[in-house]
Amino acid sequence: VGLKDSYLYAFDFSLAPISKPVKMNNIFFEFGKWTLTAASEQGLNELVKLLNDNPNITIELSAHTDLVGNDADNKTLSLRRAQSVVDYLINHGIDSQRLTPVGYGEEKPVVVDEALHKQYPYLPKDQVLDEAFITTLSVDKQEVCNSLNRRTEFRVLKTTYNLY
């Protein structure tokens, strides 16, 4: 068709890994319980929308606790919290086959990233917020670390649900 030359174009861009957990900052539970608070509704509805907009993904929904209490109770509490979020999603039309609840208890403490270090300069970058570190801090800083460890996250497990 009259073409004499060919060109090769190279693009360099970064793509965030889909398996990296996404922290949901606006999911809240009653103290020591797995009951979702009314303040969680907006965040939960955003997750429903995300899942409806992406019907081929499956996710792991994980809940984490702080160091307060014993390990077994924290593991049970976190699993019940993850299940509460999953139940909400199912009640809002998301297929249960796309959702895997996991309770990690205090097994996976937060690792301080650059953003957390900037927000809390006393937390060194790459520091694991585990018991050994937290107990070296003042009481008010311990509570900050405990609150950071109490979290709900999701990560994408598959992007091929119902495609084949």
Regions found by a protein language model. Give the residues of each.
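Periplasmic peptidoglycan-binding/tethering modules of Gram-negative envelope proteins
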Residues: V1-T58, Q97, Q119-Y122, K141-L148, ...
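Conserved phosphate/oxyanion-binding catalytic-loop motifs
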Residues: L61
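Periplasmic OmpA-like peptidoglycan-binding domain that tethers envelope proteins to the cell wall
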Residues: H64-Y164
